[in-house]
Design a protein with these regions (language model features):
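Bacterial carbohydrate/catabolite-sensing allosteric modules
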Residues: 1-50, 56-159
């Protein structure tokens, strides 16, 4: 009997119905086809932002992941707003020595892929100031305590 060598990658995401997630879903499906691996999506419908009964129950979906069949796990970490849920996903994967990749958010216990927003924000603001002469620029950074929002706000203050 021949052993199946097709790799299987799990993807954990929350708030399933967003455009942000749709772009990743399409990219993962395309890459799976191109590089001959399978992808399993695990998702909560809400962003798990509030620590209410509904979110707690929904967050448990990730504990049902059969890590015995996975070769790796990818988290679209910024979609999963609850830090305890994030940590539990990593702990669940670590029990089976499954590598975890966190996209767009540094997360202990994972390899993190982080986008670099600072230089782009600096270029944008410098362009508005130097090339267009703007001196009073109103700025809305995004969510409070969000790593990238805080970085953008700091660049705004620096420039």
């Amino acid at each position: 009997m021949q052993e199946n060598t097709t790799k299987i990658i799990g993807v954990c995401v929350a708030d399933i119905s967003t455009d942000y997630n749709d772009r990743f879903f399409e990219a993962f499906k395309r890459l799976a086809h191109e590089f001959h691996f399978k992808v399993l999506f695990f998702s909560a419908f809400s962003p798990l932002y509030w620590d209410q009964k509904h979110d707690i129950g929904e967050g448990n979906i990730y504990q049902l992941i059969d890590t015995d069949v996975l070769d790796g796990l990818i988290m679209l970490t910024i979609t999963i707003k609850n830090e305890l849920v994030r940590k539990s996903i990593i702990e669940h994967a670590k029990k089976r020595h499954i590598p975890v990749i966190s996209i767009e958010y540094p997360l202990e216990g994972s390899l993190s892929i982080i986008y670099e927003y600072k230089s782009t924000m600096r270029k944008l603001l410098s362009h508005l100031i130097n090339d267009h002469g703007y001196r009073r620029i109103n700025f809305i950074a995004g969510q409070k305590d969000n790593l990238f929002s805080e970085e953008r706000l700091q660049v705004y203050r620096d420039v």
